[in-house]
Amino acid sequence: MGEETGGDYHVVLEAAWIVYNVDDEDDAINIAIAEAGKRLNRHGLDYVDIDVGFYECPECGNEIEGVWIVAGTALVRLILSMRVFNAESEEHAIRIAKYEIGQALEDVPLGVVEVTPL
């Protein structure tokens, strides 16, 4: 029997990032990306790509930025993507990505957006 090697995957996660004391969407997005980047870099995860997520408006079909501000507090949908190598399956790749990113971002909720084989 030959030794099996795992597969390589591109895993895209979404994070629900809260930003306090902001007045507009651009500030909320910039602060969220900067704070997430600092935490990821502190854990040596500078290879994780960070972007703001978009949603499709149910009324008009246009894309809108994933940021909502209420009472000076913003919820920003961040998109975090990374490559996972030698994973046993897509599910294993997701667990690896969530573990690595989750350790750096601590209490930030993460969800799976997409997993594609490389």
UniProtKB/Swiss-Prot annotation:
Pfam families: DUF555 (PF04475)
UniProt-listed InterPro entries: UPF0212
Coiled-coil intervals: none
Cross-referenced HAMAP family: UPF0212 (MF_01223)
UniProt family annotation: Belongs to the UPF0212 family.
Protein name as catalogued: UPF0212 protein MK0748
Biological source species: Methanopyrus kandleri (strain AV19 / DSM 6324 / JCM 9639 / NBRC 100938)
Lineage: Archaea, Methanobacteriati, Methanobacteriota, Methanomada group, Methanopyri
